[in-house]
């Protein structure tokens, strides 16, 4: 038989040329496979299952367990089929046809079981254990070993999330190879030698990897277990439901295991085109936010005394309807970036149909009008499942996928830190660097751990200088060695420029990114941080866009949408964005706010946002759990979590990621928890407005009927760079981004996950630290107009008079505590002990 290889992200199958094939015989069956194929893989293609423990298709071969040994004609002894490649004319006999191979496999199994404990009745792996299964299928009924089994103290916590039972380990090295090869975190190793060999960590070196949970899942025995799941359930007691991760924009496939209406664990699903078989720990363990005791289960309304009290759904909906009707045309809608496509579409339609406004925005973060223009021109309506050419006239690319990103010869990251903001993208970049030497360049203040693990090159950029850097890369003029290499690499076929949401804070940054893409021929892709942002664009949850990427000010676009929605026309006025909605509400220009899943601390100016909520005459909050918004709302309506509802996420590729409800709507809360779209439908009915979105199927059908906009696109972003701040001695320009594990609300409820957060540290260059009178390890005070953030200092190679802070980590609420945003000037100096006078910093 001739084997074909498929292109994972589309494009159909490509036949392997005959000169690249070798033909061999396995158990009497002839097969032709590409050169370099392992014997164990060739056997799989014939349907022959060879037992194994150390082998994994996404890890480099190790031959550690020896369970997969087969007989190869011409060889003096059996060989490990996971380490030998197929050669032309090779004849292989597996345990099915070779007594030699069968006896050898029995011997290996007997050896592995000598010290393995009889823990199966209590082991978390029992019922889904490869060792258990293969001991039955390829082992013997008795053992010649009669001595006392070796035991160790158990379990050993190698992190707050991962527990190690050393006596169960079969030394397959899957966990160590994953950590070293895939994640780039060689924090666990096989230590000692011979009979003393075991998995362990270095002294005082905890297993602080964002991907540690994958080692639990790929462990073929119960040696590594989850601290949060240990002894909680048995595999055969669980109901498994396929799902999609709701955290970042990667769209990772997951498997949700639940029991008696409660999610017990979440695993990575096998999705070769997206996350392969890996997910980050945030996606694996970050699901308990929906199981907290403060979960909202019933509507709340504010009574005459100003207190929120429980109410029935009809009562709450009627009060909300009256308040919104009284403010029609003067209501702002803030949806946040975590909604499904269907829910975001419902908000978009509700804003236009029920509230008669284009004042709607999903961007609960730093944003700009330039970004809105960029999204309309280069993102909306483009992507893997949305159409659009793979290369636009401006050089941007709508066809960038995980696979094309992995195959790219060079990648430039701008305003984007892959490991912290899209871990699945980071794993592909690291894999590409390891496998074919992909060149990664990053415009950033310092080389992050993720950049170093991807073999990347830092192009040091102070906040605001990204525009200058991009223009220099486009022209190829005025660059030093690293920049020259990047400019040349970006001109190679298939190169990619990745821009993150943080580039919106740099005036002219996105405009320059488009110019650089056009000048170099590199494809341009935008990767946001949150799961719902890409879908919100297509749903029209922006002041400038209607569903399908239609410009809100285009007459034909409005006519198309109005006709489908049964309206004479839609609002004409260009709507307000998030910042403008907040400001208008704070000034009393808006009378009501409809807020969905937005946390005040995430907004660019939390203080002004609180003022907006206080000044707005009427606030309706759709929420899972109490928040600063719900505490100030007049009506609070509870909604379903991701595990409780079906829906769709659109990942950064533009790939549609459908998922069904893992739980029935009332299983988690014991009360009805409707989707956001269902709540809006009931609210529209109470307002006597026809929304026409009674269920998911109807909503999806309506979105499909609208389709993507085929008319003229919105104009290109045209923004020039602004003047850069000039810090004096004792001052610095603030830089920062959010870490993957921080103070986010969707991470609450899992103490084990919180235990592996990276410590929050401030960063300064050596020269700036000396100028400010601090040294490595000292507590640095970063002071803004609202107050100060105090963190331990880590002296780092980075531009002078720039200070980097994690934006939402413990003790580092930059916007809330200091009242500043990246790109602004702050004062820096040693933290002042309580009761002491502040030090003067000499100019």
UniProtKB/Swiss-Prot annotation:
The record's free-text note on cofactor binding: Binds 1 [2Fe-2S] cluster per subunit. Binds 3 [4Fe-4S] clusters per subunit.
GO molecular function list: 2 iron, 2 sulfur cluster binding; 4 iron, 4 sulfur cluster binding; metal ion binding; molybdopterin cofactor binding; NADH dehydrogenase (ubiquinone) activity; quinone binding
Name this polypeptide is given: NADH-quinone oxidoreductase subunit G
Residue ranges of every copy of the 4Fe-4S Mo/W bis-MGD-type domain listed in the record: 238-294
Cofactor(s) in the UniProt record: [2Fe-2S] cluster; [4Fe-4S] cluster
Gene (name only): nuoG
Organism the protein comes from: Streptomyces coelicolor (strain ATCC BAA-471 / A3(2) / M145)
Binding positions for [4Fe-4S] cluster 3 per the UniProt entry: 245, 248, 252, 280
Function as written in the Swiss-Prot or TrEMBL entry: NDH-1 shuttles electrons from NADH, via FMN and iron-sulfur (Fe-S) centers, to quinones in the respiratory chain. Couples the redox reaction to proton translocation (for every two electrons transferred, four hydrogen ions are translocated across the cytoplasmic membrane), and thus conserves the redox energy in a proton gradient.
